[in-house]
Regions:
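Short, low-complexity disordered leader/linker segments with a strong preference
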Residues: 1-25, 50, 54
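Extracytoplasmic "Venus flytrap"
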Residues: 23-51, 62-71, 165-167, 219, ...
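Extracytoplasmic/secreted envelope proteins and their assembly/folding machinery
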Residues: 41, 45, 74-77, 93-96, ...
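Structural motif
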Residues: 60-82, 190-205
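Beta-alpha junction/loop-to-helix N-cap segments that form part of ligand/metal-binding clefts
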Residues: 66-123, 214-232, 236-241
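Conserved acidic residues
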Residues: 86-88, 156, 210
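Pocket-lining segment of extracytoplasmic ligand-binding domains
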Residues: 161, 167-242
Length: 245
């Protein structure tokens, strides 16, 4: 897995807080507000602090949230480039992709990204090159499937709901289909574009599936209660990558 360095190592040599007294500026770009991404944001800042970078002492954060809007992400990227921030923390796959498209010079540390190679953020997950590095939030899908089958051992059809615009979600669904197929289980997909599509997508699976799997997906994580309201009524078990508490 790609490993992010907490200090301003970024994609180059390690640079500790004691090396310079100057104030550094870090742009933090978050795709949308939900529990998992909020925790990643706080964790990054805490990691920086553990390396000696204290907010308003030797590091200044420019925190931006795109509210799940691609045009907002592009504006945030241009803001960071124009302001010549020293480092960008990109939270979620679409965020990292937008930041990487905007600059090849500013180091980018990404988090809440499932697969850097699939997202075209790196040539290899094991050996990142260029200005992007980070951590992966890939689910143990094989273990999740085993758990689902323990809960609902008679499962023959699994429904999955995910965002059609997130390559990280498609990757996880492809893995699920392979693992489930090896067990003779069918996977039925229902994709969404926005949170407004979730209820209809969930209803489309009722009567067709025995259980539901939701990958790590930003659209889904921000509105899991909408899906669960449907699956609870239909008495369908749900296994998910993450959800906003």
């Amino acid at each position: 897995l790609l490993m992010a360095v907490g200090a301003l190592a970024g994609c180059g040599g390690e640079k500790k807080a004691d090396d310079s007294k100057k104030m550094v500026t870090v742009g933090i770009a978050q795709l949308v507000e939900h529990g998992a991404l909020d925790a990643a944001n706080k964790g990054f800042v805490a990691g920086m602090a553990s390396k000696g970078f204290k907010e308003n002492e030797n590091v200044k954060y420019d925190r931006q949230n795109a509210q799940a809007d691609q045009s907002n992400l592009q504006n945030i990227a241009q803001r960071f480039v124009s302001n010549k921030v020293d480092l960008i923390c990109a939270i979620a796959t679409p965020t990292a992709q937008t930041m990487a498209n905007a600059t090849k010079d500013i180091p980018i540390v990404a988090t809440a990204v499932t697969d850097y190679e699939v997202a075209k953020l790196a040539a290899s997950n094991s050996e990142p090159k260029g200005n992007v590095t980070g951590t992966s939030d890939m689910n143990p899908i094989d273990q999740q499937l085993e758990l689902l089958l323990k809960i609902a051992p008679q499962t023959k059809n699994i429904g999955t709901v995910y965002s059609s615009s997130e390559v990280n979600s498609q990757l996880q669904v492809d893995v699920l289909k392979k693992l489930a197929g090896d067990k003779g289980i069918n996977v039925i997909e229902a994709t969404v574009s926005t949170v407004n599509d979730i209820q209809q997508a969930a209803h489309s699976l009722v009567g067709k599936v025995d259980a539901v799997y939701v990958p790590t997906d930003n659209v889904m994580a921000s509105s899991m209660p909408t899906l669960v309201a449907v699956t609870d009524e239909a008495r369908l078990p749900v296994i998910c990558g993450e959800s906003d508490p």
